[in-house]
């Protein structure tokens, strides 16, 4: 008897969940397709001592991303000849407009060595959480030697009044806000990459020094293209 009641209760729960799901699908108000983007598709020409020049999208990105995807990119250099590559990728109409940067990197010759989340202190606003990737790829120097170039990359996603360093959180927020808040995020991701120059140039920077350099650059550049967090 207890077993029969338990089975009946489970069946009722399944039916209730199914009914609620169908009701949400049937009666949820369609989200506003014109929801604003969380970024402006522009990068500054100057960030402190850093001077930037426009750079085109990579061939891997052109192949993987739909033609309506917005991309802006600049390569920056400071007086000591350190360099930073900054990029904003803004989704178009198709869901595949955005993906994890980890998908494109192997096509550009990079190997991902580690991944974690770091905080970027910002003036007058909460710290930004970004995913950090430590990368390597073989490069040939002018003297003919082949060495392993190391690099530090920071990236994060920006939606309508929200940011996250995690791809799965972006996916969850997309579904949740679409159903509950009738909000259709037009997501973008921002990434900032710099080579780790220790051993490659005079006064080269190690991994932690490169991270600090990127933190300072982001703190100066972010207010020009992003309002949150």
Explain the meaning of each model-derived region.
Residues 1-7:
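Cytosolic-side transmembrane helix boundary signature
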Residues 2, 12-13, 36-39:
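Short acidic/polar alpha-helix capping motifs at helix-coil junctions
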Residues 9, 60-64, 121, 143:
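Intrinsically disordered, low-complexity segments enriched in polar/charged residues with Gly/Pro
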Residues 9-25:
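Hydrophobic membrane-insertion alpha-helices, especially the h-region
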Residues 13-17, 43, 183, 214:
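Active-site-proximal structural scaffolding
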Residues 29-47:
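Alpha-helical transmembrane signal-anchor/signal-peptide segments
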Residues 43-74:
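Short extracytoplasmic
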Residues 76-217, 224-229:
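A cross-kingdom signal targeting lumenal/periplasmic-facing segments of multi-pass membrane
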